[in-house]
């Protein structure tokens, strides 16, 4: 998006959040900053707590009395994945600390009047040097490498640009409350990888079906995290895309050069802001000078 002004903010600092809010005076805040690596959240719970819970608490405290719409991006991992087809009224029972931390974030967000919470699972084109599941599958297949796909782990992942369209519609309708948002149907992660291989014309035989039980993860994972999205479809009067339609949109944007355009645009923002990528964070010249002054 051209012509967008940006600013940096420490999301775990209430003071930093208040300064950025004062500078931009937003009418809508979309809170999607999160530590999403499930294994890393389990191994470093303190960091996960700071990023996923404390940041949300700081944000809520900063805007609780302000006339601002808050939209929070949560996760399908708040459900236990035992039976699948989860609706918003089903019991929340996260199996890992990532899911726990995101649900704690939901509870904070619920303190804000008229807030909107989306429980979702997304894939798309990343700005930073990390990959969504869709990107990882595509990169591996492009290199003609075999990959494993869980045949017994299902989900309702939705393409990010389709999700953005849904958020836009929800804003226009002033939607509030908790909603599942995913593809209108579901598939296993093995089937998801095969669908990408098929859509991008790669060898489907490179995708091998395995059981999630064959992997010794630190964090327990739900097997059936497919979502019932009827509530959202009814409120928006909008048909959510199927998994196939999401993957087709993913492919369409790939052919149009969107991944390169995203990387190019973010590089321009970094140059204009004198910001340097460092791991999952950005540091600027002021940060560097502060470190030098202490050495």
Describe these PLM feature segments.
Residues 126-128, 153-164, 181-199, 241, ...:
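Substrate-binding strand-loop-helix patch
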Residues 11-51:
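NAD(P)H-binding glycine-rich loop region in Rossmannoid oxidoreductase-like domains
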Residues 43-71:
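NAD(P)-cofactor binding segment of oxidoreductase domains
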Residues 243-295:
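Amphipathic terminal alpha-helices
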Residues 107-155, 161-162, 168-169:
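NAD(P)-dependent short-chain dehydrogenase/reductase
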């Amino acid at each position: 998006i051209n012509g967008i002004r940006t600013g940096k903010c420490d999301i775990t600092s209430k003071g930093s959040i208040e300064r950025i809010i004062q500078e931009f005076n937003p009418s809508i805040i979309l809170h999607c900053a999160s530590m999403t690596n499930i294994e890393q959240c389990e191994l470093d719970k303190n960091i996960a707590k700071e990023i996923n819970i404390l940041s949300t608490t700081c944000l809520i405290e900063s805007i609780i009395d302000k006339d601002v719409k808050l939209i929070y991006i949560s996760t399908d991992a708040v459900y236990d994945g035992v039976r699948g087809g989860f609706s918003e009224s089903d019991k929340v029972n996260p199996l890992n600390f990532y899911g726990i931390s995101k649900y704690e974030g939901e509870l904070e967000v619920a303190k804000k009047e008229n807030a909107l919470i989306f429980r979702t699972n997304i894939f798309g084109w990343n700005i930073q040097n990390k990959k969504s599941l869709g990107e990882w599958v595509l990169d591996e297949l492009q290199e003609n490498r075999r990959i494993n796909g869980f045949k017994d782990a299902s989900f309702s992942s939705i393409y990010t640009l389709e999700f953005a369209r849904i958020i836009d519609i929800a804003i226009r309708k002033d939607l509030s409350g908790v909603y599942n948002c995913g593809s209108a149907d579901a598939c296993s992660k093995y089937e998801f990888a095969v669908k990408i291989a098929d859509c991008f014309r790669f060898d489907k035989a490179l995708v091998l079906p395995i059981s999630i039980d064959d992997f010794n993860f630190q964090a327990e994972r739900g097997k059936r995290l497919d979502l019932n999205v009827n509530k959202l479809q009814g409120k928006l009067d909008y048909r959510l895309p199927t998994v196939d339609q999401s993957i087709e949109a993913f492919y369409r944007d790939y052919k149009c050069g969107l991944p390169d355009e995203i990387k190019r645009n973010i590089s321009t923002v970094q140059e204009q802001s004198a910001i340097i990528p460092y791991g999952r964070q950005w540091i600027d010249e002021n940060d560097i000078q502060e470190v030098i002054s202490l050495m």
